[in-house]
């Protein structure tokens, strides 16, 4: 039933007889009015503020065609309440020494919530779902706790929750399953759009990396305005911009900028001829470009902070779709001309093509290897090393086990005493032979090491003589023991330095090698004798 409001006059009329009742006032509306309440006037003018909430939060309202077609009169002042003085510029100059009104200072203060660390406030901050929330409890709760259930506070919470609910693959197994799932999803046939059910695919093409063009690094150049020349438009401007080049330059004051070069008419003819003859360039021709604009630049690449990966797609008919990487992003903004100074830059860029050198070809091969060759990650390398160690440890354990089994079998299944003695003799002879071979190999290695460290005999003797002469001049008043000790130490240090410089060169023959080994042993024995004398 529709609500009604009874006034004092209506109450008085209710006690009068029906004959004395007055007729209700006639409404200005043709149709019957269901609600007789008159709406109050709007207390303030429209502010043109964007309504941040859902319009259907309280009621789902749908405007009629009459309301949509009606144009409301908006009566405002011609200057919108802002008086602008175009004559005196000092009108809007702010005096920094003026003190603000206390009311304005409060508006400029930052709202800092006081820390609620008291026990009573923590108790009031608890939400008890089974308790009925009366007005007294709600006001008490809002006094101490911070309520986040208001829709005004929840703006943007759904967007934040979408980011937090995304699956983050932290462990290795989840990453592997996610990668395998992509291959499985790629095999499924596409029947409809992922977000638009009524949209169906017309053609399905596979997507692959562009192995053909990946060797060439690509960059995305973004202009702040159309770089086409003003006197040309349409297809001619597009053809000219497709042949354009950018180069870094420096002016007379040492300021760097980017120059935008466009081809001259003769260059356009040469490029058109090359395209018709299906060749990249003519080896002997020279292509001229004239400067058109000057720009300031901002470059971002993989080494820059906040870099985001960017890719572009190439559609090849009958083959598929290929994607390539945009390593660099260059933003160009027009360079401001100095006041009263006209840009006198009239540069001409002369281009002549050549074949790629070895360094450039190596760089292309390195980029191609990024796609073809799989470099193992650190985790894979660590796992491989651990597996190798485990395999090596198992081999050692097997060898130890086999040796112990052999010993046990020999003890258990021993024959006669003569057979045992003969076997022992054979084993001793084999061990002695192998020991001699090992000792000879060890001696040869030791000789090589000594030669590398101490050098040959002749060099060590010359070094010793020179060291003796030098020390004799420097330490004439010292004792014999100190002289002998310094002689041995100096001989060792000089022979070590000389051998380091010599060890890099290979030996020409085996005879010289053996002679130098004998000399190194002699040098080592001399140094050891000198050490014993000093001791």
From Swiss-Prot:
GO terms for biological process: cellular response to lipopolysaccharide; endodermal cell fate commitment; mRNA 3'-end processing; negative regulation of myeloid cell differentiation; negative regulation of transcription by RNA polymerase II; positive regulation of cell cycle G1/S phase transition; positive regulation of transcription by RNA polymerase II; protein localization to nucleus. Residues 502-511 have a biased composition (Low complexity). The keyword Ligase does not apply. Disulfide bonds: none annotated. Residues 1-23, 361-535 are annotated as: Disordered. GO terms for molecular function: chromatin binding; RNA polymerase II complex binding. InterPro entries: RNA_pol_II-assoc_Paf1. Keywords: Coiled coil, Isopeptide bond, Nucleus, Phosphoprotein, Transcription, Transcription regulation, Ubl conjugation, Wnt signaling pathway. It comes from the Eukaryota. The modification Phosphoserine is found at residues 117, 456. Residues 352-400 form a coiled coil. Residues 375-398, 458-470 have a biased composition (Acidic residues). Its main location: nucleus. It is found in: Nucleus. Residues 361-374, 399-434, 442-453 have a biased composition (Basic and acidic residues). There is a cross-link at residues 133, 154 (Glycyl lysine isopeptide (Lys-Gly) (interchain with G-Cter in SUMO2)). One of its GO terms (cellular component) is Cdc73/Paf1 complex. PANTHER family: RNA POLYMERASE II-ASSOCIATED FACTOR 1 HOMOLOG (PTHR23188:SF12). Component of the PAF1 complex (PAF1C) which has multiple functions during transcription by RNA polymerase II and is implicated in regulation of development and maintenance of embryonic stem cell pluripotency. PAF1C associates with RNA polymerase II through interaction with POLR2A CTD non-phosphorylated and 'Ser-2'- and 'Ser-5'-phosphorylated forms and is involved in transcriptional elongation, acting both independently and synergistically with TCEA1 and in cooperation with the DSIF complex and HTATSF1. PAF1C is required for transcription of Hox and Wnt target genes. This is RNA polymerase II-associated factor 1 homolog. It comes from Mus musculus.
């Amino acid at each position: 039933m529709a609500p009604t409001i009874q006034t004092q006059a209506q109450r008085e009329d209710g006690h009068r007889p029906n004959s004395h009742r007055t007729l209700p006032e006639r409404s200005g509306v043709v149709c019957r009015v269901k609600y007789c309440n008159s709406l109050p006037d709007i207390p303030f003018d429209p502010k043109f503020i964007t309504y941040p909430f859902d319009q259907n939060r309280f009621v789902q309202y749908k405007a009629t065609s009459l309301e949509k077609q009606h144009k409301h009169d908006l009566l405002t002042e011609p200057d919108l309440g802002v008086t602008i003085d175009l004559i005196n510029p000092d009108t809007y100059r702010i005096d920094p020494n003026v003190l603000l009104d206390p009311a304005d200072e409060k508006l400029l203060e930052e709202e800092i919530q006081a820390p609620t660390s008291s026990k009573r406030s923590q108790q009031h901050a608890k939400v008890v779902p089974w308790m009925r929330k009366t007005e007294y409890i709600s006001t008490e709760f809002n006094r101490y706790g911070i309520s986040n259930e208001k829709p005004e506070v929840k703006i943007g919470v759904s967007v934040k929750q979408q980011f937090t609910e995304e699956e983050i693959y932290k462990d290795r197994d989840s990453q592997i399953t996610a990668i395998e799932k992509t291959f499985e999803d790629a095999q499924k046939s596409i029947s409809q759009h992922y977000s638009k059910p009524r949209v169906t695919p017309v053609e399905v093409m596979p997507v692959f990396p562009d192995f053909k063009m990946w060797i060439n690094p690509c960059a995305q150049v973004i202009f702040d305005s159309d770089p086409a020349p003003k006197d040309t438009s349409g297809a001619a401007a597009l053809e000219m911009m497709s042949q354009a080049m950018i180069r870094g330059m420096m002016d007379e004051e040492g300021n760097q900028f980017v120059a935008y070069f466009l081809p001259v008419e003769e260059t356009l003819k040469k490029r058109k001829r090359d395209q018709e003859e299906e060749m990249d360039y003519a080896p002997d021709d020279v292509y001229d470009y004239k400067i058109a604009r000057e720009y300031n630049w901002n470059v971002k690449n993989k080494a820059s902070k906040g870099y985001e990966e960017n890719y572009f797609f190439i559609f090849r008919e009958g083959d598929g779709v290929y994607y390539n990487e945009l390593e660099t992003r260059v933003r160009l903004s027009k360079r401001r001309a100095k006041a009263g100074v006209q840009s006198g830059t009239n540069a001409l860029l002369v281009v002549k093509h050549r074949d790629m050198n070895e360094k450039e070809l190596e760089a292309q091969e390195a980029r191609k290897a990024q796609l073809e060759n799989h470099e193992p990650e650190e985790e894979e390398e660590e796992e491989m090393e651990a597996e190798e160690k485990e395999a090596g440890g198992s081999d050692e354990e097997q060898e130890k086990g086999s040796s112990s089994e052999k010993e046990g079998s020999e003890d258990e299944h021993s024959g006669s005493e003569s057979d045992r003695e003969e076997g022992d003799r054979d084993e001793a002879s084999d061990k002695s032979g192998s020991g001699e071979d090992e000792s000879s190999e060890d001696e040869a290695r030791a000789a090589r090491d000594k030669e590398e460290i101490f050098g040959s005999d002749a060099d060590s003797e010359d070094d010793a003589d020179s060291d003796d002469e030098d020390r004799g001049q420097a330490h004439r008043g010292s004792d014999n023991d100190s002289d002998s000790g310094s002689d041995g130490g100096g001989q060792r240090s000089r022979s070590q330095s000389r051998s380091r410089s010599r060890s890099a060169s290979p030996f020409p023959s085996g005879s010289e090698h053996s002679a130098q080994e004998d000399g190194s042993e002699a040098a080592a024995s001399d140094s050891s004798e000198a050490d014993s004398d000093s001791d």
